[in-house]
Amino acid sequence: MNLADKVLAVNNDLPIRTDSPVHSGKVRSVYWLTATDSKRLIEEKGYDVPSDTSLAIMVISDRISAFDCIWSGENDMRGVPGKGAALNAISNHWFKMFKEQGLADSHILDIPHPFVWIVQKAKPVMIEAICRQYITGSMWRSYTKGERDFCGIELPEGLAKDSKLTSLLQTPSTKGILEGIPGVPAVDDVNITRKNIEDNFEAFNFKSVDDIARYEKLLTEGFDVISTALSKIDQVFVDTKFEFGYVKDVNGDDKLIYMDEVGTPDSSRIWDGEQYRAGKVVENSKEGFRQLLLNHFPDADILLNKDRMSEREALARDNKLPLSVLMDVSKTYTDIAEKITGNKIVLSDNPKAEIIAILREQYQLID
């Protein structure tokens, strides 16, 4: 078996019993279980949710996306070995820590396999909850253009690239394209202010105005938990994106939870502490891959300019990256996962076959 066979590139074709279309995201696919299977698993496994809760199987892949495109490599390498398992392991670690420290629950009810979560259905808050401790990335690009108002926050003069901000800043954006919200352009992932959220809290799926403060508190507390833990392994938590949603608790009441993923190299910038103190930025996140792509192709504007999306998609489709590039990304992801969790990331020989066997034999979800 060659290395490409150990990569789970296609994750939306599993024979899981469902009566709904499979949702295929950039990295994860979601299989909504039938009402009968959801109720059965809640009873058999003792999940702490109402008996009529809708459950789903969420399967991560090893695909790598950047600049809204999926990238692949030579030798039919359609993903990054170990990436999916590393991302799930990191999220599992932080979600568990959040719960132990009394912050909030997540949507995860069970982990049958390193690539698989069983989750309860949540109503997502339509906000990309972004926190920044350092000025870099899109904030720095805006700053260099003379912009000093960022998501309604006034930035001081004299800031230096990659420097630490005086306080943790929350700089939210929309989750996808939201239409009909006054003052919020109907474009993907557009920056918004707290006032935008307050004035239109229902459009962002908040149950009440008070829940805005609750979400902000969970965002700050979650960031601080991860930042403190990363500092102990000499890593700098630079910025991150959280997602939140509502689920029903066992009493049928709404509760705000963390969802999607948290504190991973896909959703965060993580810098090596020793290198940062020496004046260098060494990425232990997907940002390193993004920078490589910007340097790899002659016309970086294709990757940054949303008006050139068709050219960008052709670039990703027609160019196979060197195998060494994907293996470097693999090492970045598995190394940081092992540092965070203290456990080795083991590559599955045939992840799809393993998942099918477990879901058939232990969960009776495959005929």
From Swiss-Prot:
It comes from the Bacteria. The keyword Repeat does not apply. One of its GO terms (molecular function) is phosphoribosylaminoimidazolesuccinocarboxamide synthase activity. The gene is purC. This is Phosphoribosylaminoimidazole-succinocarboxamide synthase. It comes from Colwellia psychrerythraea (strain 34H / ATCC BAA-681) (Vibrio psychroerythus). Pfam families: SAICAR_synt. NCBIfam families: PRK13960.1, purC_vibrio. One of its GO terms (cellular component) is cytoplasm. Keywords: ATP-binding, Ligase, Nucleotide-binding, Purine biosynthesis. PANTHER family: PHOSPHORIBOSYLAMINOIMIDAZOLE-SUCCINOCARBOXAMIDE SYNTHASE (PTHR43700:SF1). Its EC number is 6.3.2.6.
